[in-house]
Curated annotation (Swiss-Prot):
It comes from the Bacteria. Belongs to the chlamydial CPn_0206/CT_203/TC_0475 family. It comes from Chlamydia pneumoniae. This is Uncharacterized protein CPn_0206/CP_0561/CPj0206/CpB0210. InterPro entries: DUF1186.
Length: 251
């Protein structure tokens, strides 16, 4: 017999040191019924961020993000963006390594309006790792075949030229890396200007790296590599096993 909704939500709310396999599996089976509750969890999380930061054991918002990403629930996108739209280290405090490792895939999985992701990228002073995740989210959308490369390259050109605030940060580093993933040939000049302006950390990616990709790759080869390696969030249980691999699995 499947767990009821209240029991599922209770098991997903807090880190008990055990992966709640049964609750995750039941949530997936009850997708239609549980989706409104998961959306409410995200909305609630946006209203009590300080409490979540102070309570290191709460994880309901993380399970909600992964499940809604697996469900391709577009109503989650503005809530996730609001949850991460902070200037300080709050995003890392509420999500840990999910911020840098999986947020791009989560954003891409729930996205049916990339203007929301673009708005996050362009908002001044937002945590640069959040902006970087949003940039990678657009690249992921290309790899998943949800938006065309040319559209993202045109937007990245706008970021290079005037839309991204001209302050050195990981957002700039990841922008250059994202362009290289899509093939950087068309944007060689604005990329070189970014390097000349000191906006990019050359220990992360260098102009030589960019030039090597231009000389050794093509648009087609870059997109083939991207598409063959891109995965949206398809299995919450598998994703959480990756993060909780040091925990015992619930029998």
């Amino acid at each position: 017999m499947l767990m009821d909704i209240s029991h599922i939500l209770e098991d997903l709310a807090y880190d008990e040191g055990i992966l709640p396999r049964e609750a995750i599996e039941a949530a997936i089976v009850k997708q239609m019924q549980i989706t409104p509750y998961l959306l409410h969890i995200l909305h609630d999380a946006t209203q009590r961020v300080p409490e979540i930061v102070n309570d290191g054991s709460y994880q309901g918002h993380l399970y909600a993000m992964y499940l809604l990403a697996q469900f391709r629930e577009s109503r989650a996108l503005p809530l996730i963006i609001k949850l991460f739209a902070f200037e300080d280290d709050t995003p890392h405090a509420i999500a840990g390594d999910v911020l840098t490792e999986d947020l791009p895939r989560i954003l891409a999985s729930v996205c049916n309006d990339d203007s929301l992701i673009k708005e996050l990228i362009e908002t001044p002073k937002i945590n640069p790792y959040v902006k970087a995740a949003a940039i990678s989210g657009l690249v992921t959308l290309v790899g998943a075949g949800k938006i065309p490369r040319d559209k993202v390259i045109r937007y990245f050109a706008e970021l290079l030229n005037y839309r991204l605030e001209k302050q050195p940060s990981f957002a700039w580093d990841n922008l250059i890396a994202g362009i290289c993933t899509l093939y950087p040939g068309e944007l060689f000049y604005p990329i070189s200007k970014a390097f000349d302006g000191g906006l990019v950390d050359t220990s992360f990616i260098s102009m030589e790296d960019v030039e090597n990709i231009i000389h050794e790759e093509t648009v087609e080869s870059c997109i083939h590599t991207l598409c063959s390696s891109t995965e949206l969030i398809n299995d919450t249980l598998e994703e959480m096993e990756k993060w909780l691999e040091d925990f015992p699995i619930e029998p």
